[in-house]
Design a protein with these regions (language model features):
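Short beta-strands within extracellular/lumenal beta-sheet-rich domains
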Residues: 137-149
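Short, conserved beta-strand segments of beta-strand-rich sandwich/propeller modules, principally
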Residues: 40, 95-99, 155-157
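Short, Lys/Arg-enriched N-terminal segments with co-localized hydrophobic residues
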Residues: 3-17
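Low-complexity, Pro/Ser/Thr- and charge-rich linker/hinge segments at domain boundaries
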Residues: 119-140
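Aromatic-lined ligand-binding clefts that engage carbohydrates, nucleic acids, or primary amines
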Residues: 149-150, 154-170
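Pro/Thr/Ser/Gly-rich low-complexity, intrinsically disordered linker/stalk tracts
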Residues: 18-48, 118-122
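Recognizes extended acidic, P/S/T-rich segments that occur
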Residues: 51-95, 101, 105-111, 130
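Predominantly extracellular/luminal cell-surface or secreted proteins
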Residues: 28, 46, 59-63, 101-103, ...
Length: 173
Protein backbone atom coordinates (compact mmCIF):
# COMPACT_ATOMS: atom_id res chain seq x y z
CA UNK A 1 0.00 0.00 0.00
CA UNK A 2 1.08 3.55 -0.69
CA UNK A 3 1.15 6.36 1.82
CA UNK A 4 -1.57 9.00 1.55
CA UNK A 5 -0.52 12.53 0.71
CA UNK A 6 -0.30 15.13 -2.01
CA UNK A 7 -3.11 16.84 -3.87
CA UNK A 8 -4.32 13.69 -5.60
CA UNK A 9 -6.48 10.99 -4.06
CA UNK A 10 -3.97 8.18 -3.64
CA UNK A 11 -4.06 4.52 -4.54
CA UNK A 12 -4.97 1.89 -2.01
CA UNK A 13 -3.57 -0.98 -4.05
CA UNK A 14 -0.56 -1.07 -6.40
CA UNK A 15 -2.49 -2.20 -9.52
CA UNK A 16 -4.83 0.81 -9.63
CA UNK A 17 -3.89 3.37 -12.28
CA UNK A 18 -4.14 7.14 -12.20
CA UNK A 19 -7.48 8.37 -13.57
CA UNK A 20 -9.01 11.67 -14.63
CA UNK A 21 -12.61 12.30 -13.64
CA UNK A 22 -15.08 15.15 -13.12
CA UNK A 23 -13.92 16.83 -16.35
CA UNK A 24 -15.87 20.05 -16.85
CA UNK A 25 -16.27 23.05 -19.12
CA UNK A 26 -17.24 26.27 -17.34
CA UNK A 27 -17.98 24.23 -14.19
CA UNK A 28 -20.48 21.95 -15.99
CA UNK A 29 -20.20 18.39 -17.26
CA UNK A 30 -21.09 18.17 -20.96
CA UNK A 31 -22.87 21.56 -21.09
CA UNK A 32 -25.32 22.24 -23.92
CA UNK A 33 -26.77 25.46 -25.29
CA UNK A 34 -24.47 28.01 -23.66
CA UNK A 35 -22.87 31.07 -25.26
CA UNK A 36 -19.35 29.98 -24.28
CA UNK A 37 -17.86 33.45 -24.60
CA UNK A 38 -15.09 32.18 -22.33
CA UNK A 39 -14.11 28.52 -22.24
CA UNK A 40 -12.55 27.21 -19.03
CA UNK A 41 -11.67 23.55 -18.51
CA UNK A 42 -11.21 21.76 -15.18
CA UNK A 43 -10.72 18.17 -14.00
CA UNK A 44 -9.80 16.02 -11.04
CA UNK A 45 -7.25 13.23 -10.72
CA UNK A 46 -7.47 10.17 -8.48
CA UNK A 47 -5.45 7.06 -7.74
CA UNK A 48 -2.13 8.78 -8.48
CA UNK A 49 1.15 7.88 -6.84
CA UNK A 50 2.49 11.37 -7.49
CA UNK A 51 1.90 14.31 -5.23
CA UNK A 52 1.25 16.92 -7.93
CA UNK A 53 0.43 17.34 -11.58
CA UNK A 54 3.52 17.79 -13.76
CA UNK A 55 1.68 18.74 -16.97
CA UNK A 56 -1.70 18.73 -18.68
CA UNK A 57 -2.69 18.69 -22.32
CA UNK A 58 -6.12 19.84 -23.50
CA UNK A 59 -7.37 18.84 -26.93
CA UNK A 60 -10.58 20.07 -28.59
CA UNK A 61 -11.94 18.45 -31.75
CA UNK A 62 -14.93 18.58 -34.06
CA UNK A 63 -15.46 14.82 -33.82
CA UNK A 64 -15.80 12.30 -30.98
CA UNK A 65 -12.86 10.25 -32.31
CA UNK A 66 -10.65 13.33 -31.69
CA UNK A 67 -9.24 13.08 -35.23
CA UNK A 68 -10.06 16.62 -36.40
CA UNK A 69 -8.32 18.74 -33.79
CA UNK A 70 -9.28 22.39 -33.47
CA UNK A 71 -7.02 23.05 -30.48
CA UNK A 72 -4.09 21.27 -28.82
CA UNK A 73 -2.36 22.92 -25.87
CA UNK A 74 0.58 20.54 -25.96
CA UNK A 75 2.06 19.41 -22.64
CA UNK A 76 1.64 22.52 -20.49
CA UNK A 77 3.62 22.30 -17.24
CA UNK A 78 1.84 25.38 -15.85
CA UNK A 79 -1.70 24.05 -16.42
CA UNK A 80 -4.03 24.15 -13.43
CA UNK A 81 -6.60 21.38 -13.11
CA UNK A 82 -8.90 23.85 -11.32
CA UNK A 83 -8.98 26.55 -14.00
CA UNK A 84 -7.54 26.21 -17.50
CA UNK A 85 -8.86 28.96 -19.80
CA UNK A 86 -8.62 28.42 -23.56
CA UNK A 87 -9.38 31.00 -26.23
CA UNK A 88 -11.42 29.26 -28.90
CA UNK A 89 -13.27 30.64 -31.93
CA UNK A 90 -16.51 28.71 -31.46
CA UNK A 91 -19.39 28.50 -33.90
CA UNK A 92 -22.97 28.82 -32.63
CA UNK A 93 -25.14 25.70 -32.24
CA UNK A 94 -22.14 23.38 -32.59
CA UNK A 95 -20.99 20.36 -30.59
CA UNK A 96 -17.30 20.16 -29.71
CA UNK A 97 -15.44 17.24 -28.17
CA UNK A 98 -12.51 17.44 -25.78
CA UNK A 99 -10.29 15.49 -23.44
CA UNK A 100 -7.45 16.12 -21.07
CA UNK A 101 -4.22 14.21 -20.56
CA UNK A 102 -2.33 14.76 -17.31
CA UNK A 103 0.96 13.58 -15.88
CA UNK A 104 2.12 13.36 -12.28
CA UNK A 105 5.51 14.06 -10.74
CA UNK A 106 5.89 10.28 -10.35
CA UNK A 107 5.83 9.80 -14.14
CA UNK A 108 2.27 8.51 -14.38
CA UNK A 109 -0.10 9.65 -17.12
CA UNK A 110 -3.84 9.45 -17.63
CA UNK A 111 -6.23 10.53 -20.36
CA UNK A 112 -9.85 11.41 -19.64
CA UNK A 113 -12.78 9.99 -21.52
CA UNK A 114 -13.87 12.18 -24.41
CA UNK A 115 -16.31 14.84 -23.17
CA UNK A 116 -18.38 17.33 -25.13
CA UNK A 117 -19.82 20.80 -24.91
CA UNK A 118 -22.32 22.41 -27.22
CA UNK A 119 -22.72 26.08 -27.98
CA UNK A 120 -26.12 27.74 -28.19
CA UNK A 121 -27.48 30.51 -30.36
CA UNK A 122 -25.24 33.55 -30.62
CA UNK A 123 -26.12 36.88 -32.23
CA UNK A 124 -28.86 35.19 -34.23
CA UNK A 125 -32.47 36.30 -34.51
CA UNK A 126 -35.14 34.05 -33.04
CA UNK A 127 -37.19 32.84 -36.01
CA UNK A 128 -39.97 31.13 -34.08
CA UNK A 129 -43.38 32.67 -33.49
CA UNK A 130 -44.07 34.10 -30.05
CA UNK A 131 -47.05 32.64 -28.27
CA UNK A 132 -49.02 34.26 -25.50
CA UNK A 133 -52.34 34.14 -23.69
CA UNK A 134 -55.19 36.52 -24.65
CA UNK A 135 -56.93 36.15 -21.32
CA UNK A 136 -56.63 38.87 -18.68
CA UNK A 137 -57.34 36.36 -15.91
CA UNK A 138 -54.67 35.89 -13.26
CA UNK A 139 -53.93 32.25 -13.99
CA UNK A 140 -51.15 30.04 -15.26
CA UNK A 141 -51.57 29.46 -19.01
CA UNK A 142 -50.72 26.16 -20.64
CA UNK A 143 -49.50 26.10 -24.23
CA UNK A 144 -49.18 23.06 -26.43
CA UNK A 145 -47.80 22.76 -29.94
CA UNK A 146 -47.67 19.57 -31.96
CA UNK A 147 -44.85 19.39 -34.47
CA UNK A 148 -44.93 16.73 -37.17
CA UNK A 149 -41.68 16.55 -39.15
CA UNK A 150 -41.93 16.11 -42.92
CA UNK A 151 -39.30 13.35 -42.84
CA UNK A 152 -37.57 11.14 -40.28
CA UNK A 153 -35.37 13.13 -37.92
CA UNK A 154 -31.93 11.77 -37.04
CA UNK A 155 -30.97 14.58 -34.67
CA UNK A 156 -32.67 17.76 -33.50
CA UNK A 157 -32.14 20.53 -30.99
CA UNK A 158 -34.88 22.69 -29.52
CA UNK A 159 -33.97 26.21 -28.42
CA UNK A 160 -36.53 27.69 -26.05
CA UNK A 161 -36.81 31.16 -24.60
CA UNK A 162 -39.45 32.13 -22.07
CA UNK A 163 -40.25 34.43 -19.21
CA UNK A 164 -40.76 32.78 -15.86
CA UNK A 165 -40.99 29.03 -15.51
CA UNK A 166 -41.48 26.69 -18.43
CA UNK A 167 -41.23 22.99 -19.18
CA UNK A 168 -40.73 21.33 -22.55
CA UNK A 169 -41.71 17.77 -23.37
CA UNK A 170 -40.95 15.76 -26.49
CA UNK A 171 -43.01 12.59 -26.94
CA UNK A 172 -44.40 13.13 -23.44
CA UNK A 173 -40.93 12.93 -21.91
Amino acid sequence: MRKNGGIFKNKVEEDIEMKIYHAQVNHLENPMGFRMERTVFSWKVKDAEGKKQSYARIRVASDAAMEHLLFDSGEDDKASSLFYPVKLDLEPRTRYYWNVEAGSDAGETAVSEVQFFETGKRNEAWTGKWISCDSKENRHPYFEKEIVPAKEVAKARLYVCGLGLYEVYVDEK
